[in-house]
Every structure is written in C-alpha cells, then in structure tokens.
C-alpha cells in the first residue's frame, strides 16, 4: 500500500486538481488520525479548535486532539450543529477578555457534516 500504481495515480490526480504538481500527498487510515494531523498542523501551540459540544473531535476521539497539546473549545449544539451567532459570541468574548493572552486562543473551527446526529 502506498507504492502501487493506483496510489501513484491518485496522488497525481489530487496534485492536478489542486494545481500543485510538486505537492506532497499522503493517505491516512482513518478519521481520527486525519483530524488529529490536520488540526495539529493548522494550529499554533497556544491555539485550540472550536467545535460544537457534540462534534466528533469534542466527543468521540478519545482525547486525540488534546494529545497534541491543543484544546477543544466547545460551544452549544443544535441537532449537532453550531450556530454562527454562538461562534461569533464566543470569539467576541475571547477578544474582549482583558486576559486573552492567558487563555487558549481559538485558531480553527471544526464543522461536523454530517453531524453526530446525522443532521446535514
């Protein structure tokens, strides 16, 4: 796995679709591993990811995100989804906090689609 003609072809198709002929393309074995690697790569060491309280990274990945040193910052859910108004309120509260430099900074948002409830 990984060095066969099908994998090579898939890599080339992904590079072409992205317009990045020199890009490294890696295939991962599962969702938790993928979420962990992507989120860790996106975030600085002092940042966390905002997710609905029922989001997969918050409720079903057995601390995989926290294992990399990042915190999952949760907001309310509605049938598994977050509301833009709740996210905005969370971010405004963070930025208005006089001690924001001592708090985990929100650096990414995790959106479940479909949600843990099957909501689209």
Describe the predicted segments one by one.
Residues 24-43, 73-80:
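Conserved core of the PLP fold type I
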Residues 69-120:
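PLP-dependent aminotransferase-class I/II
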Residues 20-23, 44-47, 69-70, 104-107:
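Short coil/turn connectors at secondary-structure junctions
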Residues 41-59:
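Conserved PLP-anchoring active-site segment centered on the Schiff-base-forming lysine
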Residues 1-31, 53-58, 64:
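Conserved N-terminal alpha-helix of the aminotransferase class I/II PLP-enzyme fold
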Residues 34, 57, 117:
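Glycine-rich nucleotide phosphate-binding loop and flanking beta-alpha elements
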Residues 40, 56, 62-64, 69-71:
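Domain-start "cap" segments at the beginnings of catalytic or binding domains
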């Amino acid at each position: 796995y990984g060095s066969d003609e099908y994998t090579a072809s898939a890599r080339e198709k992904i590079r072409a679709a992205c317009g990045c002929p020199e890009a490294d393309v890696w295939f991962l074995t599962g969702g938790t591993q993928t979420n962990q690697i992507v989120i860790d790569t996106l975030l600085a060491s002092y940042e966390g990811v905002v997710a609905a309280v029922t989001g997969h990274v918050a409720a079903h990945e057995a601390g995989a995100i926290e294992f990399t040193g990042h915190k999952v910052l949760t907001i309310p859910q509605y049938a598994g989804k977050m509301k833009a108004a709740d996210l905005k309120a969370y971010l405004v509260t963070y930025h208005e906090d006089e001690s924001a430099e001592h708090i985990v900074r929100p650096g990414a948002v995790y959106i479940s689609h479909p949600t843990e409830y099957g909501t689209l």
